UniProtKB/Swiss-Prot annotation:
Tissue distribution of the protein: Expressed by the venom duct.
Main location: secreted
Comment text on domains: The presence of a 'disulfide through disulfide knot' structurally defines this protein as a knottin. The cysteine framework is VI/VII (C-C-CC-C-C).
Cellular compartment(s): Secreted
More info: Authors confirmed the assignment of this toxin to the M superfamily by cDNA sequencing.
Protein name: Conotoxin pr6d
Modified residues (4-hydroxyproline): 5
Keywords in alphabetical order: Disulfide bond, Hydroxylation, Knottin, Secreted, Toxin
GO terms for MF: toxin activity
Source organism: Conus parius
Disulfide feature: 7-20, 14-25, 19-30
Presence of the UniProt keyword Disulfide bond in the record: yes
The keyword Chloroplast belongs to this UniProt entry's keyword annotation: no
Length: 32
């Protein structure tokens, strides 16, 4: 694993990237 400068926004896939801010990852989709 590496540290990537990008993150997933609301409604975006989070199976490969973590979610931005403090969102949660549900069913591989970021949710507020």
């Amino acid at each position: 694993y590496g540290n990537f400068p990008t993150c997933s926004e609301t409604g975006e896939d989070c199976s490969a990237m973590h979610c931005c801010r403090s969102m949660t990852c549900r069913n591989n989709i970021c949710a507020d």
